Design a protein with these regions (language model features):
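N-terminal low-complexity, acidic/polar interaction/targeting segments
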Residues: 1-125
Length: 125
């Protein structure tokens, strides 16, 4: 089943189970974060690479608002949960993207498992 969620494009890659500290300053994203935080909703972070928005992103949730500033800016912790693929996107009346998303599953092969094991062994040396 596909879901429509708010989208936050950023120049970073958010991975499942990772936690990031973000500074929210744009008016449209302050509205989005206030919405998802008060309702407990999830939202998606997609990477912006070379001015292009990725179709693959990570569903996340605001874990904590660390600090709020006089003009409504805020520092927040977000946690990634699972990856998604963007199907359709639109800009809502508050100016931020909302996208219809579906779960994204990596195609795993024996080659990728071998490469992963080699990389891990090099870090263990």
């Amino acid at each position: 089943m596909n879901s429509l969620i708010p989208i936050f494009p950023l120049e970073l890659v958010l991975f499942p189970e990772s936690i990031y500290l973000l500074h929210i300053f744009e008016e449209r994203y302050k509205k989005m974060i206030n919405r998802v935080y008060t309702t407990g909703e999830v939202f998606g972070i997609v990477s912006v690479i070379n001015s292009r928005i990725s179709k693959i992103g990570c569903i996340c949730k605001v874990e904590k608002i660390v600090r709020t500033y006089n003009k409504g800016e805020m520092d927040i912790y977000v946690k990634g949960y699972e990856r998604f693929n963007t199907i359709n996107s639109l800009i809502n009346r508050d100016g931020y993207f909302e996208s219809e998303v579906e779960p994204y599953f990596d195609n795993k092969s024996r080659d990728s498992e071998i490469i992963f094991e080699v990389v891990l062994s090099r870090f263990a040396e």
